[in-house]
């Protein structure tokens, strides 16, 4: 019938709210995956695609400023994987380089310290989430570049 009920228990109201939010996030991730599919997770998809991003966008890049923008994005999309490396005590430069050379769907498994097929292992990201994150970050960067200033909280 397409309907399910998830019952969750918790010792405190705060714990129950936290669990409810986690379930809602998981449900939204499943809906996103159903709508637009999944990508290999762990930051590997964007790292692998960044290598030929300038070639792919060659017909859309009209000047040096736009080319610089693409190069900035090429570097920025590697940051999530670099941060995961740092969190795991691994060398970001080596792993990011190696992930960039891997076949489709492959990435680094931090628990086993080796390259694996991420889709096979269930390490996935909803394509919609990745697309929206990239679009939103480019939009914010564009706004900052064109406004020439920003007020930030440190």
Please report, for each region that a protein language model flagged, where it lies by residue.
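Extended, low-charge hydrophobic alpha-helical regions
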Residues: 2-154
